[in-house]
Amino acid sequence: MELDITRILRILPHRSPFLLLDRVIEVQPRKSARAIKCVTYNEPFFPGHFPAQPMFPNVLVLEALSQLLAVLAYASDPFDPATKVFYQLGFENVKFRRPIVPGDRIELSVEIVQRRSNIWKAKGEASVDQHLCSHAELLAALTDRDELPTGT
């Protein structure tokens, strides 16, 4: 299964500048998913990260992997994005191996390692031109929107 940006927008609550998936190129429900993010110099963070040598922020690679895991969770067991939210609980064994720069096409992949009820654990990788840039283990949960803690 492949998802274009229109279908991604129906699943994820994220919008520009924090929607970090351009296309989901493969989904195997309950198993894995792959997506791409095309990095351009017009990204809003490049003027400050870093002006003389722009690099895609590593924390946004983790966010992109989290978004892809949310799409995989939806494809595995559809939920109503208006009433449910898929959110990140944590990351483990995170490694950043290569910088990502304007002009790169990030290839993202997530693979489910374990699922218990509403908790999902997955392995994620980000590569450019078949060179591994980063990898991490992701832990996330699906919950009712009204059960999320507020900032107060």
Tell where the protein language model's regions lie, with residue ranges.
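A residue-level detector for short acidic-glycine micro-motifs
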Residues: 23-26, 93, 98, 112-114
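Short aromatic-glycine motifs in intrinsically disordered, low-complexity regions
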Residues: 3-15, 82-83
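Hydrophobic beta-strand-centered segment that forms part of the acyl-chain substrate-binding groove
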Residues: 1-2, 69-107, 133-135, 140-141
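HotDog/MaoC-like acyl-thioester-processing domains
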Residues: 13, 30, 100-104, 111-152
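Beta-strand-rich interaction surfaces with strong enrichment in secreted/lumenal proteins
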Residues: 9, 52, 95-98
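Hydrophobic core residues within well-ordered beta-strands of beta-rich domains
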Residues: 18-20, 106, 120
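Catalytic strand-loop segment that frames the active site of acyl-thioester-processing enzymes
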Residues: 16-56, 61
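Helix-adjacent hinge/juxtasegments
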Residues: 49-81
